[in-house]
């Protein structure tokens, strides 16, 4: 594992991606903890943390410019609270192939009102009962979930499912959280096989499409 230091950040690739966003490439260093990002001087629109060992999405300083975070193929099982305070413009959070377990663990994203794109593909959470409708209900700001546009009929179905006392009871039953996090606990001894290079490229293309889609909506 490699500690995310200011020196590493300075050495990593930095470039303008196809949608003209400034991107920092931190892929493949087996970084366990997000830290020291103040060293970026808030100069990036996108940070790519793919292929590391991050277990919790937190540790961000105030980064007013950052809009897109890619965390494909890590070990993420927790999302920190109050992300909106440190990432006031966060639009995209890609968590494909991680270890998110319980629907209630997504509740910390409720306050991130700027979030429009979320991917939880290849996470245990996606096999939970009513997964997609629960996320649509809890995170109405999300327009693209697992690279599929949230349709109006899905919003209506989610509203109906969680309406009234029965709906509230169902949401409470579904929305339990994982037990208190202990580093290394309840994690597989072998990391599941991650996306292939082709998969990663596809995710990149999809993310670029999301950015274009978001910008188009913003300009309407």
Language model feature labels by segment:
Residues 102:
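Active-site glycine-rich loop that binds ribose-phosphate moieties when present
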Residues 1-48, 53, 65-68, 84-92, ...:
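Long, contiguous C-terminal flanking segments immediately downstream of a protein's structured core
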């Amino acid at each position: 594992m490699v500690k995310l230091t200011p020196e590493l950040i300075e050495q990593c690739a930095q470039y303008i991606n196809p949608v003209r966003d400034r991107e920092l490439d931190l892929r493949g260093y087996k970084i366990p903890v997000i830290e020291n990002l103040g060293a970026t001087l808030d100069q990036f629109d996108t940070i790519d943390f793919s292929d590391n060992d991050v277990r919790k999405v937190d540790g961000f300083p105030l980064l007013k410019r950052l809009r897109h975070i890619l965390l494909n193929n890590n070990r993420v099982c927790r999302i920190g609270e109050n992300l909106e305070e440190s990432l006031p413009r966060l639009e995209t959070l890609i968590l494909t192939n991680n270890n998110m377990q319980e629907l209630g663990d997504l509740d910390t994203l409720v306050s991130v009102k700027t979030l429009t794109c979320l991917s939880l593909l290849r996470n245990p959470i996606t096999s939970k009962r009513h997964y997609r409708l629960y996320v649509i209900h809890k995170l109405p700001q999300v327009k693209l979930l697992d690279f599929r546009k949230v349709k109006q009929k899905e919003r209506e179905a989610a509203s109906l499912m969680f309406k009234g006392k029965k709906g509230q009871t169902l949401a409470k039953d579904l929305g339990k959280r994982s037990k208190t996090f202990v580093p290394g606990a309840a994690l597989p001894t072998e990391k599941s096989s991650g996306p292939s290079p082709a998969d990663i490229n596809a995710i990149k293309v999809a993310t670029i499409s999301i950015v274009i889609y978001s910008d188009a909506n913003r300009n309407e």
